[in-house]
């Protein structure tokens, strides 16, 4: 096992998020990672147009994201992403993602974070939209859970593809009385 964590090893810092930056997989990177533990980062793994195979790994206590992937490709098996200030897994501007036997659990102490966030676009500060096809975001036998009523956030624009599948997954989703109560992207959960 390889462990990336903050350099403060006293017990009171064990669960403190944001002690160091990120593991950055830059454009064109192709990584194969097994048995990795990331703790206390700002962003555990930051990906921009890169490819990752991630197996038997853990990402805990990140102040922003466990994994933030833009226009990337991830195949993940048997991973745990837990506690992040914004999202354990955030994929934006499309890409290609497959997760099997993974747990995404977010018990952060606010009501704004999500365990999993999936979009096919991103809006820049000047309101410009960057979009790309979400070729696939498939989750097989995964757990998506946390401290909020809705732990899965889907958001798409129609001009590019938005393909997703959740098969045999446990998803915490109680949307009664929320702004997404009638959103068709979530119809697969309500059936």
Ranges and model annotations:
Residues 1-191:
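Beta-strand/loop edge motif enriched in small/polar residues
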């Amino acid at each position: 096992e390889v462990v990336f964590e903050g350099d403060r090893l006293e017990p009171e810092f064990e669960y403190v998020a944001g002690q160091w930056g990120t593991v950055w997989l830059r454009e064109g990177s192709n990584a194969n990672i097994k048995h990795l533990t990331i703790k206390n980062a700002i962003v555990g793994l930051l990906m921009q147009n890169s490819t990752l195979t991630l197996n038997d790994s853990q990402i805990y206590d990140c102040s922003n994201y466990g994994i933030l992937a833009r226009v990337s490709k991830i195949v993940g098996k048997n991973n745990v992403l837990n506690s992040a200030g914004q999202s354990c897994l955030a994929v934006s501007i499309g890409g290609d993602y497959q997760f099997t036997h993974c747990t995404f659990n977010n018990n952060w102490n606010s009501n704004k974070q999500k365990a999993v966030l999936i979009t096919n676009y991103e809006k820049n500060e000047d309101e410009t939209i960057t979009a790309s096809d979400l070729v696939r975001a498939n989750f097989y036998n995964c757990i998506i859970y946390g401290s909020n009523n809705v732990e899965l956030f889907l958001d798409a624009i129609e001009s590019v593809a938005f393909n997703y599948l959740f098969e045999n997954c446990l998803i915490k989703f109680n949307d009664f009385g929320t702004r997404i109560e009638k959103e068709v992207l979530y119809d697969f959960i309500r059936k």
